[in-house]
Amino acid sequence: TWEAKIGERPDAEVMAERKEHYSASVPDRVAYLTAGIDSQLDRYEMRVWGWGPGEESWLIDRQIIMGRHDDEQTLLRVDEAINKTYTRRNGAEMSVSRICWDTGGIDPTIVYERSKKHGLFRVIPIKGAS
């Protein structure tokens, strides 16, 4: 893991030069997409990551879905986020291959039932760290 040394800061100009611009939401080098959903009492937070050769990764999307964790309308918006597709530069659509959904902090049966709906090999219930 990377550790910042006290007093060490990246040069803003160097960082600006390294910035990459994409014409699509998914960079060309991405081979597949994964996601994680964090469960909270008042929201769900989902992050979608694109993975390329050599474990290179890109944050593709971040969604915060506000609402009670057990409200059907909130869960329908989570379903939409799970089923969202992402576009490559050539116009091809990609969907998320695997999703880990945190069961901690809420009634886990909500996550289990929703995972079954989407397919347990695609949406996998997990116990997140406390």
Ranges and model annotations:
Residues T1-G7, S39-A81:
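Metal-dependent catalytic core segments for phosphate chemistry
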Residues T1-T34, R47:
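A contiguous, basic/glycine-rich beta-loop/short-helix subdomain that forms a polymer-engagement track
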Residues I37-S39, S97-G104, I126-K127:
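Short His-Asn-centered micro-motif
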Residues R43, G52-G54, D102-D107, A129-S130:
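Short loop/turn segments at secondary-structure transitions that flank enzyme active sites
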Residues G67-R98, R114:
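Short, basic/hydrophobic alpha-helical segments
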Residues P27-L33, S39-Y44, P53-G54, R89-S97, ...:
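Short, well-ordered loop/turn elements at secondary-structure boundaries
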Residues G105-S130:
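Metal-dependent DNA phosphodiester-chemistry modules and their immediately adjacent helices/loops
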Residues E17-Y22, A31-T34, N83-T87, D107-E113:
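Short alpha-helical segments and helix-capping/turn motifs at coil-helix boundaries
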